[in-house]
Regions:
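Phosphate-group recognition and catalysis centered on beta-loop-alpha active-site segments
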Residues: 2-337
């Protein structure tokens, strides 16, 4: 009797193990198949659709977005950078891309990093590390040298060590309002502005930014971005007239939809622009399949951060609407000439 029970028990264990093995094989095949799908270089021909999105460019007319106003050419996000791009004789940019954060006194300054530690002499000036802009007033931050750690093409740091009156005005902390006023006084450009703050500060930044854009009649030439879902939801609820880009999960959703070519109704996607890296993560988003699908659904596609000329040309060839680059001069030579 005991032997019979042991045989039954062994048989049951064997069946369970076989079932588990089959399940694992099925899961592995599914994961492998899905991996192949999201990493595949789809070779669809670029298509033209009847769209209403002004940021969808004609094939071959890929727009150039100066990342942080051309961060490899000039100290990022400074007036010097905006001046340099606008006054350059050898290249032009279509967009200025920059990030904004709120100060203690509700000024919207141009800054990518969480703190000013690595782009200025803030640690030395304030005597502390982790100098967050929201802890200081604009007037306090205006004393900083925002070109402190900038390296030029030769690896030199031409503005390092400037202090006090030695710091030119175009190397000091810059507000979004001043930057936009200067640029618009020169010519009309497009802008991609990312709100870096989250939570209450993110909402406050959105309010301030909207007021600036509205007062300057720039609502139709600005794409507002954020990686923070709470900020996106706040924008959607309070400022539906703004053009905006997708946040992470929205971008992932469109990407998956594009692989399976899911037929979505008009207006399904609540964003106007997809701004993604082509191949930074596991997923291969730099494909004509994704661009065609986005265009079909009235969504423009910008890729970041593209500093390789071969990649620039490839993305242009598959229908990219814009590339975000640290070197707008090289991008202009590559894409426009």
């Amino acid at each position: 009797m005991n032997k019979t029970n042991e045989k039954k028990k062994s048989s049951l264990i064997l069946k369970i193990l076989k079932a588990l093995l089959i399940t694992l094989i099925v899961i592995a095949l599914f994961v492998f198949g899905f991996y192949k799908l999201i990493t595949h270089q789809w070779q669809d021909e670029p298509q033209t659709y009847d769209t209403t999105n002004q940021y969808i460019a004609d094939l071959g007319d890929t727009m150039i977005l100066a990342h942080r106003a051309g961060r490899r050419l000039f100290p990022q996000g400074t007036m010097m950078a905006f001046e340099g791009c606008i006054n350059a004789e050898t290249f032009k940019t279509d967009f200025f891309e920059f990030d904004v954060r709120v100060t203690k006194d509700d000024k919207l300054i141009i800054l990518h990093d969480d703190t000013l530690d690595e782009v200025s002499n803030a640690v030395e000036y304030f005597g502390v590390t982790d100098v967050y802009p929201e802890d200081y007033t604009y007037d306090e931050l205006y004393n900083l040298n925002m070109g402190e750690f900038f390296k030029d093409a030769d690896g030199e740091m031409p503005y390092n060590g400037l202090r006090g009156d030695e710091i030119p005005d175009n190397l000091r902390v810059l507000t979004a309002e001043k930057a936009l006023s200067y640029v618009e006084g020169c010519s009309e450009y497009y802008y991609s502005i990312e709100i870096k703050n989250s939570g209450y500060l993110g909402a406050r930044a959105a309010d301030i930014l909207y007021d600036i854009l509205s007062d300057m009649n720039l609502l139709d030439r600005v794409i507002v971005a954020s990686f923070n879902k709470d900020v996106i939801l706040y924008l959607e609820e309070n400022y539906p007239d703004l053009y905006r880009s997708a946040y992470n999960m929205e971008a992932a959703g469109l990407f998956i939809d594009s692989i399976f070519n899911i037929d979505r109704p008009d207006g399904y996607y609540k964003f106007d622009v997809l701004q993604v890296p082509p191949d930074k993560y596991i997923a291969n988003m730099g494909t004509s399949k994704l661009i065609n699908y986005a265009h079909k659904n009235n969504v423009a596609v910008h890729y970041w951060t593209i500093n390789d000329t071969d990649k620039m040309l490839f993305l242009q060839s598959i229908g990219a609407d814009g590339i975000i680059t640290d070197i707008p001069d090289v991008a202009y030579d590559t894409l426009k000439n």
